[in-house]
């Protein structure tokens, strides 16, 4: 389209009435503070005894492939205890569910726990040039997996992303493990304040369709500004961008979200 505006300027030009309404809404969000007493609860540690045994990250040498991967993706060290490692993923998969039959490749393990800290599945990330890059396993095929349930604070805003690694860079976030699952999240969190952060792929029809449906149901969505070219949160972190601020400043709903969405699709 050739022109680039932030959402405020865009609304002011296209719809002055909506611009006033949106500006007032943002003003109210920033200036009304409700003070309340917060009782801090100790975060329960995952019940690792409920998960199949694997090598813990802290047991690996500093030049190990798994360590090098975590460092290369700038994953904070205080998050490393959320990962594991296996050189025999096929055997590990059978320990998760005897019906799995997979090759014995080496993978970084991302265990998935429910809200009671019980192991319900795992995502394996290839550390070699093997496809698929990610394989998700379920202990029980009937269970819908969501990453991050065991660390969630339901009284705070919840950020919803696609992949577990992206979720580690946001406060109080979950990963729905596949773009097709975004539309099912509200079913589980009917009364919570959700913000959906889809990958920044305006030419991906599937992503666009999902975002459009979320907007139509009046959900809050992050629509990245035109100057952000990185595809996902981790890529933005690698470019030293302040992803939390970017997301907070570019979260919209209703008519403002639809205007931003249409601009996002045209200008990328």
Model-derived regions: residue spans:
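TOPRIM metal-binding catalytic domain and adjacent DNA-binding surface shared by DnaG-type primases
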Residues: 14-108, 116, 217, 249-268
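TOPRIM fold recognition
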Residues: 4, 132, 155-158, 164-268
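Alpha-helix initiation and N-capping motif
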Residues: 4-8, 21, 63, 67, ...
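Short metal-binding segments enriched for Cys and/or His
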Residues: 1-16
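Short glycine-/small-residue-rich flexible loop motifs, especially phosphate/cofactor-binding loops
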Residues: 8, 67, 71-72, 77, ...
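Short acidic alpha-helix initiation/capping motifs at coil-to-helix transition points
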Residues: 2-3, 58-64, 224-225
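Beta-hairpin (beta-strand-turn-beta-strand) motif
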Residues: 1, 113-115, 199-201
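Phosphate-handling DNA/RNA-contact segment within nucleic-acid enzymes
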Residues: 90-193, 207
């Amino acid at each position: 389209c050739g022109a680039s505006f932030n959402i405020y300027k865009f609304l002011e030009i296209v719809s002055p009435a909506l611009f006033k309404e949106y500006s007032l809404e943002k003003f109210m969000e920033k200036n009304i503070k409700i003070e309340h007493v917060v009782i801090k609860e100790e975060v329960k540690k995952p019940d690792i005894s409920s998960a199949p045994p694997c090598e813990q990250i802290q047991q690996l040498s500093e030049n190990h492939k798994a360590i090098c991967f975590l460092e290369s993706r700038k994953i904070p060290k205080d998050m490393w205890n959320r990962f594991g490692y296996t050189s025999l993923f096929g055997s590990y998969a059978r320990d998760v569910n005897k019906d799995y039959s997979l090759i014995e490749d080496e993978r970084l393990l991302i265990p998935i726990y429910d809200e009671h800290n019980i192991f319900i599945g795992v995502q394996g990330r290839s550390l070699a040039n093997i496809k698929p890059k990610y394989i998700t396993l379920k202990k029980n095929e009937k269970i819908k997996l969501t990453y991050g349930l065991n660390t969630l604070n339901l009284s705070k805003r919840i950020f919803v992303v696609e992949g577990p690694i992206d979720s580690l860079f946001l406060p109080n976030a979950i990963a729905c493990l596949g773009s097709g699952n975004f539309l099912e999240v509200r079913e589980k969190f009917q009364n919570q304040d959700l913000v959906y952060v889809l990958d920044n792929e305006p030419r991906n029809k599937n992503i666009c369709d999902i975002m459009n449906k979320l907007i139509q149901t009046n959900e809050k969505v992050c629509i990245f500004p035109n100057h952000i070219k990185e595809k996902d949160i981790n890529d933005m972190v690698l470019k030293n961008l302040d992803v939390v601020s970017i997301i907070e400043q570019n979260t919209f709903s209703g008519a403002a979200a639809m205007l931003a969405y249409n601009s996002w699709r045209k200008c990328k």
